[in-house]
Amino acid sequence: MSNVDHAEIAKFEALAHRWWDRESEFKPLHDINPLRVNWIDERVNLAGKKVLDVGCGGGILSEAMAQRGATVTGIDMGEAPLAVAQLHQLESGVNVEYRQITAEALAEEMPEQFDVVTCLEMLEHVPDPSSVIRACFRMVKPGGQVFFSTINRNPKAYLFAIVGAEYIMKLLPRGTHDFKKFIRPSELGAWSRMAGLTVKDIIGLTYNPLTKHYKLAADVDVNYMIQTLREE
């Protein structure tokens, strides 16, 4: 059985044409992208690295990593977001290879092929996040690093990520997230270790509604990223 939630795919298919509109529903992704790319780049030095972006969507992160000098492959199961990503790279002149394939299927095809694997804002949209994490482990080379980001599962996260972001501030369309699919750092860490990865670092991402700015912080109550390593 494929680890794909077709309702989740349909949700992003419907919005795909606005993926690169910085004032659209995807504004938060555009706003946090520089923070995330810098954090990753500081840890792996993307230039010259072979990178896989799992759940790449319309290519916001994929393009940014390619601009840092990485050779990037982006995979997603959404046909419309991938079409948008392909079109946008013609405009931007950035070269990314995009494929419509699951992480699990690509792991069969390309084990231990990537220096870096990123899987950001994707785990909370699949039926079995641990399956994706295992696939990421299989695809990264020994000594390589895997980065995940998702949303914590607690009352504060519900208040900020769903009530605040979707209903009050309208940063995201209603129904973007399902609270039951949010993932605690302890769960993500445990799944990573079970897959064979070593957790190296964790950082939170906070939003100030007054300044409308995001920043990296020690607070992992809502959005957070983790850095993991496949030991050699």
From Swiss-Prot:
It catalyses: a 3-demethylubiquinol + S-adenosyl-L-methionine = a ubiquinol + S-adenosyl-L-homocysteine + H(+); a 3-(all-trans-polyprenyl)benzene-1,2-diol + S-adenosyl-L-methionine = a 2-methoxy-6-(all-trans-polyprenyl)phenol + S-adenosyl-L-homocysteine + H(+). S-adenosyl-L-methionine binds at residues 36, 55, 76, 120. GO terms for biological process: methylation. The keyword Cell division does not apply. It is an enzyme of class 2 (transferase). The keyword S-adenosyl-L-methionine applies. Keywords: Methyltransferase, S-adenosyl-L-methionine, Transferase, Ubiquinone biosynthesis. GO terms for molecular function: 2-polyprenyl-6-hydroxyphenol methylase activity; 3-demethylubiquinol 3-O-methyltransferase activity; polyprenyldihydroxybenzoate methyltransferase activity. Pathway: Cofactor biosynthesis; ubiquinone biosynthesis. Its EC number is 2.1.1.222, 2.1.1.64. Signal peptide: none annotated. PANTHER family: METHYLTRANSFERASE (PTHR43464), UBIQUINONE BIOSYNTHESIS O-METHYLTRANSFERASE, MITOCHONDRIAL (PTHR43464:SF19). O-methyltransferase that catalyzes the 2 O-methylation steps in the ubiquinone biosynthetic pathway. Belongs to the methyltransferase superfamily. UbiG/COQ3 family. This is Ubiquinone biosynthesis O-methyltransferase.
